[in-house]
Structure formats: structure tokens, C-alpha cells
């Protein structure tokens, strides 16, 4: 990330306790991982060290996230909202666990009964491509009768790669026809079948995101 001047902190509006809420967001898929509090000292420590430091209201002390568990958060970018009273940190979560329950995100509840981070914990909302890949992985690991995705996976490379070739040709034709709706639809078809191929070969969508981020040369979402 680009170095920030001390004036950055001076722009912020802290509450009467000298604190400001901070949202931690995954730097690749945009998933919201947690919310914590920061003060001037923790912000400065975060900027100096490159790892997220928060302020613990219960312990009344500086809190280096992951110092004990090993689940540290590498800072990728930091910004504040239009009122300068909320921070947004994009971070790289070590171990892919942000919550003390062991869940990836603290925002895993959404049902009538609490899951407490167990097997019923919800995955954090993310971008459409990440959500799609989750469904494909779920079909791979827990096949459903009549599922088109499972039919592709059962057919292996021959069936999957044939479909990628067919959809690629249709995408080319849509581009030649200069039809925006068809172009978008065919692009979506290619992406879906490509993700099925990735899942079939045990390659995660996140690996693809990491390659794209590295090629871009900037630790921010596109």
C-alpha cells in the first residue's frame, strides 16, 4: 500500500472515548470479516507494522490481531468514509480465520438459531464469482441428483473442456455480432464452465484471484 502521512489520522473523527469503528474486509473477494475499534495509537501501530492492531474495550489495551492465534491481518489498504468516522481496512487474513470461534468471518449468523461458528455457520457474502465457485465446490463435494454441475464433473475433462470450447466459440460469435446482452451471457457461460474445470482439478478460485492481483501489481480489488 502507499505510505500515508500523519495527516491521515488527523482527518478522522473519533468518538468521545477516542475510538473509531473499523471494518476489516478481505482484499481479494471483498468479504466483510470483522468489525473492531481503533484509536490513534492502534492506527499508527497498524501503519507502522503493516499488521492490524485494534483497541480492546474490554481489556482497555492495544490488541495485535492474531498475535496469539497466528491469524494476523496484513494491511493492504485503509480508507475512511464520507463522514470520516468509520475506517475500512482491506486485509490479507492469515489462516483464513478472522473470528475467535474459528469461522472465517464474524458475520456467520443469519438463521433463527445461533450456530456459534459451527457447521451451520454462514459464509460471508462475497462477489458473484466467489459465490458461484462455492456452489460448484458444494456440488463436487456433495453431489445432487439431476445437477448439471454434477453431470459435467462426472464427465471429467472430456465433457467439461468440450463445453468450454463450445461456449468460447459462441462468445466469439456474440462479439462479432456486437450484441452486448449475448456477449455478457456467453462470457458468463465460459466463466461457469471454467470454474467447473478448476474445481475438477482442485484449483481454487482464490488462487486465480491471487494471480490476477499479482499481475496487476496493486493490492486492491479491481
Curated annotation (Swiss-Prot):
The reaction(s) this protein catalyses: 1-(5-phospho-beta-D-ribosyl)-ATP + H2O = 1-(5-phospho-beta-D-ribosyl)-5'-AMP + diphosphate + H(+); 1-(5-phospho-beta-D-ribosyl)-5'-AMP + H2O = 1-(5-phospho-beta-D-ribosyl)-5-[(5-phospho-beta-D-ribosylamino)methylideneamino]imidazole-4-carboxamide
Region (Phosphoribosyl-AMP cyclohydrolase): 1-128
UniProt-listed Enzyme Commission number(s): 3.5.4.19, 3.6.1.31
Alphabetized UniProt keyword annotations: Amino-acid biosynthesis, ATP-binding, Cytoplasm, Histidine biosynthesis, Hydrolase, Multifunctional enzyme, Nucleotide-binding
Main location: cytoplasm
Pfam family, any one: PRA-PH
GO cellular component terms, A-Z: cytoplasm
Pathway membership, UniProt: Amino-acid biosynthesis; L-histidine biosynthesis; L-histidine from 5-phospho-alpha-D-ribose 1-diphosphate: step 2/9; Amino-acid biosynthesis; L-histidine biosynthesis; L-histidine from 5-phospho-alpha-D-ribose 1-diphosphate: step 3/9
Membrane-traversing stretches: none
InterPro entries from the UniProt entry: His_synth_HisIE (IPR023019), HisE (IPR008179), PRA-CH (IPR026660), PRib-ATP_PPHydrolase-like (IPR021130), PRib_AMP_CycHydrolase_dom (IPR002496), PRib_AMP_CycHydrolase_sf (IPR038019)
CDD domains noted in UniProt: NTP-PPase_HisIE_like
GO-annotated biological processes: L-histidine biosynthetic process
SUPFAM superfamilies: all-alpha NTP pyrophosphatases (SSF101386), HisI-like (SSF141734)
Disulfide bridges in this chain: none
GO MF annotation, one: phosphoribosyl-AMP cyclohydrolase activity
Cited Gene3D superfamilies: MazG-like, Phosphoribosyl-AMP cyclohydrolase
Segments of this protein annotated with the region Phosphoribosyl-ATP pyrophosphohydrolase: 129-222
Localisation per UniProt entry: Cytoplasm
Family note: In the N-terminal section; belongs to the PRA-CH family. In the C-terminal section; belongs to the PRA-PH family.
Protein name: Histidine biosynthesis bifunctional protein HisIE
